[in-house]
Amino acid sequence: MNRLLVACAALIALVSGGAQSDPLAARSKGRPDAPITLYEMSDFQCPYCRAFALGTMPVLEQEYIGTGKVRLVYINLPLTSLHPNARAAAQVALCAARQDRFWAMHDLLFRHQDEWAKLPKPSGVLLALGDSAHLDHAALDACVTANATAPEVDADAARARRAGAVSTPTFYIEGGLLEGAAPVTVFRAVLDSIYRAKTGR
């Protein structure tokens, strides 16, 4: 059941050694100064995360992210005991972020989840999806082979758990947790209430 919980601790922003002034920018949607920040703690192999990404998220993009009300930030929480390929997918997605193509890869990973989720070695399919996302193949291959983004995935997962996330998807919204792939009506109720409280509108 979806429920709103008061989190014990705030989600700590990622620390990155990259050159970006905002290390979360490559995997964020919406204005950096939006009044609400929505952290999505997700697993690329999770079917409920897929349902959110392909069903609910496009509506939120149109009604909240695109209108400047909400900034959405994707945080990796691969539940590898249930989803053994989730970590590989997360690393590929963050490699794509280094080419400013995180969201293209994000969408392809979820749309084609059935094609790679149960493979004993998913790297071939994941790299092929990178080609579909118009990534530099050699750079992506090098990033994946070197496990270059593994520390970022570990940092994401640690911070998600520190915020109180134990399942996916979990959403951290201004001090509270919304668990599960809630219908868009639940997101509207929560986001509208917070937006009114913060802006008076």
Residue ranges and their predicted role:
Residues 4, 17-20, 39, 61:
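Domain-level signature for proteins that mediate thiol-based redox and metal-cofactor handling
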Residues 8-24:
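Bacterial Sec-dependent signal peptides at the C-terminal "C-region" and cleavage site
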Residues 4-5, 41-43, 54-57, 127-201:
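C-terminal cap of thioredoxin/glutaredoxin-like
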Residues 34, 42-131, 163-166, 192-201:
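Structural alpha/beta surface segment adjacent to cysteine/selenocysteine redox centers
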